[in-house]
């Protein structure tokens, strides 16, 4: 039996998710970026970990296979937004989407349950992936220095703010897009988790630490079901 048999895991087929990831990587037209991404997603030592890893311990996609589900979802968002902003570089944005959380393979432990590794506690995934991706880039002879700097910047800036752990703010178009789309997918993942939980009162979910609020179950609300919450809901914001 797998650990995922006893803990929460993605409802998607991880093999299909991975096949989609390989397809997305192969579609990258920039040869340097495609070689970089494929050096990661086709690495035989990385693949099984990529299929198992969560995207977080508790904030979003915090289940086995969550990282892969998040990356594929984020790539889908990128494609939609790229159609609206055709001036953006699709290869650069997709590269950032695929690699932006790759450090979580080392930051998190996920063999038996989900937690943090010692390295993860000390360094965090941004530092881990910066070093990891930099080494991969340096192993590709002739990789353009300017392109290397853009990829590195997207990794360290994707949290968007200093207080959220990014040492630099996003400073070019694709870096900004990656930050906001990553945040959107993370928030929607947290909303989904809250709505799928059977905890809460009436039309409201239990308090979500990731979202810092309760979420309204709009289907029940629109059907005319009226509920009253305990006074404690008003004190949630003070938690």
Feature-to-residue mapping (PLM):
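Intrinsically disordered, low-complexity linkers and terminal tails enriched in Pro/Gly
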Residues: 2-3, 225-229
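Acidic/His-rich, divalent-metal-binding segments that scaffold phosphate/diphosphate chemistry
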Residues: 2-122, 145
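Generic surface-pattern signal
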Residues: 22-30, 41-46, 160, 186, ...
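Residue-level signal for secondary-structure boundary elements
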Residues: 29-33, 45-49, 141, 163, ...
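Divalent metal-dependent catalytic cores for phosphoryl transfer on phosphate-bearing substrates
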Residues: 58, 69, 80-198
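N-terminal intrinsically disordered, cationic/polar leader segments
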Residues: 179, 197, 201-209, 213-227
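Short, low-complexity, charge-dense intrinsically disordered segments
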Residues: 228, 232-239
């Amino acid at each position: 039996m797998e650990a995922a048999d006893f803990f929460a895991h993605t409802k998607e087929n991880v093999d299909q998710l991975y096949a989609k990831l390989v397809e997305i990587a192969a579609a990258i037209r920039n040869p340097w970026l495609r070689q970089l991404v494929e050096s990661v997603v086709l690495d035989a030592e990385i693949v099984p970990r990529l299929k198992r890893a969560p995207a977080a311990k508790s904030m979003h996609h915090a289940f086995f296979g969550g990282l892969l589900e998040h990356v594929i979802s984020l790539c889908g968002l990128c494609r939609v937004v790229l159609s609206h902003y055709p001036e953006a570089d699709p290869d650069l944005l997709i590269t950032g989407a695929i690699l932006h959380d790759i450090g979580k393979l080392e930051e998190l432990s996920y063999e038996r349950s989900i937690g943090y590794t010692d390295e993860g506690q000390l360094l965090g995934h941004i530092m881990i992936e910066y070093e990891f991706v930099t080494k991969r880039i340096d192993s590709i002879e002739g990789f353009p220095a300017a392109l290397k700097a853009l990829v590195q910047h997207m990794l360290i800036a994707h949290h968007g703010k200093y207080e959220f752990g990014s040492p630099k703010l996003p400073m070019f178009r694709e870096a900004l897009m990656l930050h906001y789309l990553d945040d959107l997918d993370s928030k929607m993942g947290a909303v989904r988790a809250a709505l799928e939980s059977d905890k809460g009162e009436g039309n409201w979910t239990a308090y979500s630490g990731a979202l810092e609020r309760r979420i309204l179950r709009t289907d029940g609300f629109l059907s005319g079901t009226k509920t009253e919450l305990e006074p404690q809901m008003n004190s949630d914001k003070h938690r």
